[in-house]
Every structure is written in C-alpha cells, then in structure tokens.
C-alpha cells in the first residue's frame, strides 16, 4: 500500500467551521462551567476519596449550574467525568477506587 503525504491544513479547513457570535458565546459560557467544575472537584481530590465521589461532585455541580454532562451517556459512557488514574491511558470510568498519595 502506498501512502500519500498531504497537507493537514486542507483537512482541517473542511472540518473546522467559523462560529457565529452566538456559538462563540455558548462556547464561552460552557468553558466557564467546565472551569468551575474542575475547581469544585479539585477541592476534594485527596487520598481516601473515590473516583465515584469525584464524579458525583462534578455531575451535581454541572446540573446545579443548568448544564448537562456531555460525556454521560455518550456512546454508552456511564459517567460525567473521564478519570484516568495512573496506568489508565484515557477515558477511565469512575469507580470505587480510592485515591492514594501520589495518584
């Protein structure tokens, strides 16, 4: 099979569409909620806390702020947060795993 080298710029131009002012404002509002959610979860990250508890805090905060967790239910994903601890590469599920010092 022969590979062809091409500029990724052509591909990205097809994928990325300019946003309207309204879309930009929605993105800004969502980014603020995400930032505040991470800060809220960050308050309780400590040894002895489970990743399920981190998820509960995040989901509650998101919903209390009038938003919907985007990962929850997407392609069957069971949680509001993707939590990858230690050797979990990406998109880890929250569980009864108890955080330890150094995680």
What are these regions (language model features)?
Residues 4, 8-103:
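Active-site neighborhoods and metal-handling regions in enzymes and metal-associated proteins
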């Amino acid at each position: 099979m022969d590979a062809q080298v091409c500029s990724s710029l052509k591909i990205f131009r097809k994928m990325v569409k300019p946003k309207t002012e309204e879309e930009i404002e929605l993105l800004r509002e969502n980014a603020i909620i995400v930032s505040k959610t991470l800060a809220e979860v960050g308050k309780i990250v400590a040894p002895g806390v489970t990743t399920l508890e981190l998820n509960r805090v995040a989901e509650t905060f998101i919903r209390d702020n009038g938003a919907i967790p985007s990962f929850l239910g997407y392609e069957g994903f069971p949680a509001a947060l993707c939590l990858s601890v230690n050797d979990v590469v990406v998109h880890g599920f929250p569980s009864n795993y108890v955080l330890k010092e150094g995680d």
